[in-house]
Amino acid sequence: EFPTDYDEGEDDRPKVGLGAR
């Protein structure tokens, strides 16, 4: 269950998707 809003405010998940890009 990984939301597509990594850099939005999901610090719980590892920034490996849109956050790392």
From Swiss-Prot:
Record PTM: Conversion of fibrinogen to fibrin is triggered by thrombin, which cleaves fibrinopeptides A and B from alpha and beta chains, and thus exposes the N-terminal polymerization sites responsible for the formation of the soft clot.
Highest taxon in the source lineage: Eukaryota
Subcellular localization(s) per the UniProt record: Secreted
Modification Sulfotyrosine occurs at: 6
Acidic residues bias: start-end ranges: 1-11
Gene Ontology CC annotation, any one: extracellular region
Region (Disordered): 1-21
Keywords: Adaptive immunity, Blood coagulation, Coiled coil, Disulfide bond, Hemostasis, Immunity, Innate immunity, Secreted, Sulfation
BP terms from Gene Ontology: adaptive immune response; blood coagulation; innate immune response
Function field: Cleaved by the protease thrombin to yield monomers which, together with fibrinogen alpha (FGA) and fibrinogen gamma (FGG), polymerize to form an insoluble fibrin matrix. Fibrin has a major function in hemostasis as one of the primary components of blood clots. In addition, functions during the early stages of wound repair to stabilize the lesion and guide cell migration during re-epithelialization. Was originally thought to be essential for platelet aggregation, based on in vitro studies using anticoagulated blood.
Domain notes: A long coiled coil structure formed by 3 polypeptide chains connects the central nodule to the C-terminal domains (distal nodules). The long C-terminal ends of the alpha chains fold back, contributing a fourth strand to the coiled coil structure.
Record note on quaternary structure: Heterohexamer; disulfide linked. Contains 2 sets of 3 non-identical chains (alpha, beta and gamma). The 2 heterotrimers are in head to head conformation with the N-termini in a small central domain.
Name of the protein: Fibrinogen beta chain
